[in-house]
């Protein structure tokens, strides 16, 4: 005969704390079981050619979440963005090209075309149009190639371009700042505009990073491109600031063209994810540009960014027309009330190919 020994079991009811711990343990093991079951049946994601990014619009992890501070609730931008109206962004902003007038201009244009080719190759950019039919009509586009772009490809191009576009203003502003210090003289207002331009381009980049997460390969490309471009622009600006400003003016022409083509793609129905009414501009963009309620779609965001690029085009073509060591910055200068159109921070009197020196000095 076998004798069985049974341990004593307490007949007292569980305390509230013990019951809570037991329920948490049961829930944890149940969730783990569901996750392991799903992992066995989930399809394997396909590989991507250019980047290891995992999403087009960020829904989970934020690349740069706002830090949690006990006392600081909000930090205002150092350079508040000037207001743009929808009418201004649609009627005053369009693709335009300034024809080179001397050897310096031709060198700048040649360098931009080479950089454009390198960027197209690096980002796999292939579009179904070459350019707008005429400079004054941003919507007159004729397809000449099969359509090969998508929301993801456009975001790849945006992120790569904006990561480079923020370099010239910072380099030029830094060099002029240092020259003002060692020369013991004023800079005539150029530094602020150049640094504000770099800040604005960085805001473009941060906005797109709210919608797209680059992979390690693209991050490596950005690192290499920034190193090469920063040092090259640094040396060129020491040698010929005028050529560098003309270079940036031509570079911004390409940026205006890029955003014009992407807006046209969106309006023609080639980018359905961005046309979805539920796809809204990130809060970062809404606050920076002051986007009004009802005008916060991806299309509206691209119009704002294109207007910024058109402004940089005007500023740098104008600075390229001035005497680099003598003339004041016309975009922060005050003019008489009797003057009609005049340069400023907004796009009310936007000149696509820049102001000539005799118009502003």
UniProtKB/Swiss-Prot annotation:
Fe cation binds at residues 162, 201, 204, 253, 309, 312. Keywords: Electron transport, Iron, Membrane, Metal-binding, Mitochondrion, Mitochondrion inner membrane, Oxidoreductase, Respiratory chain, Transit peptide, Transmembrane, Transmembrane helix, Transport. Fe cation 1 binds at residues 162, 201, 204, 309. Its cofactor is Fe cation. One of its GO terms (molecular function) is metal ion binding. The chain crosses the membrane at residues 155-175, 221-241. GO terms for cellular component: mitochondrial inner membrane. Fe cation 2 binds at residues 201, 252, 309, 312. InterPro entries: AOX, AOX_sf. It is an enzyme of class 1 (oxidoreductase). The keyword Mitochondrion applies. Its EC number is 1.-.-.-. It is found in: Mitochondrion inner membrane. The keyword Transmembrane helix applies. Its main location: mitochondrion. Catalyzes cyanide-resistant oxygen consumption. May increase respiration when the cytochrome respiratory pathway is restricted, or in response to low temperatures. This is Alternative oxidase, mitochondrial. It comes from Botryotinia fuckeliana (Noble rot fungus).
